[in-house]
């Protein structure tokens, strides 16, 4: 019966029917044949509508789940102390980036350009932590690459495509997830070219790497070896489109402040006023870096094309003593909170006195390691205590004061009061 109803495509006498809605070939405009089935143009249109609605729902869901700039800033504040201007710049840039991805799914006339980010700031000012916190908040794959290990293709070292392979590893080789991830390239200032003039000889770890990164950052389809890499050469390469991957580049850019000052002084002309202006401009490095222009980055050694691919520039200030003390105590994952938890697991309370926190901050400033050096200092002063404590009994509290930091004294151990032994009852 059903065979008579559907007919056969080779039998011109049989009337053909849509396998989905049951309409005959005479009731619809077009009937498309498949292996033993037929579908009419009306059912095709209905399927398109269903898919379109599902995609719209998906887009709306993504839009509602994307945190707004103010919400992004609130989360960054929980983990990163200070750097308000940089955090605001990042919050807006990231929000606009993921809105841009959403707009690409629609057929809009206006195509939004990609806005990768350059973070400029001293060592230990929070560049890497900002990028990590953003990725965690947005729940997207995140990887960190070291620019100093990269070389041009064909030379000893890592190819730039290795960055995308690391990103794929973070999301278990899910290409779709990786294509919306975040890549942080650290030490980007270390690949500046050696002189302002284009190099005659090959600069495989400087200008050459910048050239290799251009397409990757702007948006290209990168061919990446699948899981297992060279062990399975017969496998096809994975094609990863980088146009929706957000690239954040960071570096200390030591000496950039002098380039900025020189430009400002040159702009002031010549004469007696220049000397006065120069002395007035003895400011903090962070404030000088905030005035950075693309021409300063080019003079520093980044090629113009590379600077053009990083339109959003956020500068971070050098952390002072009060900021370092806050970093020690205030963030959700503050260093002192982490060590207090470790000691608490031994049933011991850990106390850092105010003078100890100040001494730790001063030592980090002296070493010029910023926030990154705080953990090293705390770890070193508590090492012996953490070694001995599990074997000791009745310790209730460990106190760290200034003398422990400055003079390498042992932390104070406070023991639980032992109950007095019970007196033997005297016989009558």
From Swiss-Prot:
Q: Which family does it belong to?
A: Belongs to the ClpX chaperone family.
- Name of protein: ATP-dependent Clp protease ATP-binding subunit ClpX
Among the entry's GO cellular component annotations, what is one?
Answer: HslUV protease complex
Originating gene:
clpX
Q: Which residues bind Zn(2+)?
A: 18, 21, 40, 43
PROSITE patterns assigned to the protein according to its UniProt record, in alphabetical order = CLPX_ZB (PS51902)
The record's PANTHER family line, in alphabetical order, gives: ATP-DEPENDENT CLP PROTEASE ATP-BINDING SUBUNIT CLPX-LIKE, MITOCHONDRIAL (PTHR48102:SF7), ATP-DEPENDENT CLP PROTEASE ATP-BINDING SUBUNIT CLPX-LIKE, MITOCHONDRIAL-RELATED (PTHR48102)
> What HAMAP family does the record point to?
ClpX
The alphabetized list of GO BP terms reads:
cell division; proteolysis involved in protein catabolic process
User: What does this gene product do?
Assistant: ATP-dependent specificity component of the Clp protease. It directs the protease to specific substrates. Can perform chaperone functions in the absence of ClpP.
NCBIfam families xrefs = clpX (TIGR00382), PRK05342.1 (NF003745)
Claim: Lyase is one of the keywords in the record: no
Q: How does it assemble?
A: Component of the ClpX-ClpP complex. Forms a hexameric ring that, in the presence of ATP, binds to fourteen ClpP subunits assembled into a disk-like structure with a central cavity, resembling the structure of eukaryotic proteasomes.
Name the keywords, alphabetized. Answer: ATP-binding, Chaperone, Metal-binding, Nucleotide-binding, Zinc
Pfam families this protein is in?
AAA_2, ClpB_D2-small, zf-C4_ClpX
- The residues covered by the ClpX-type ZB domain are 6-59
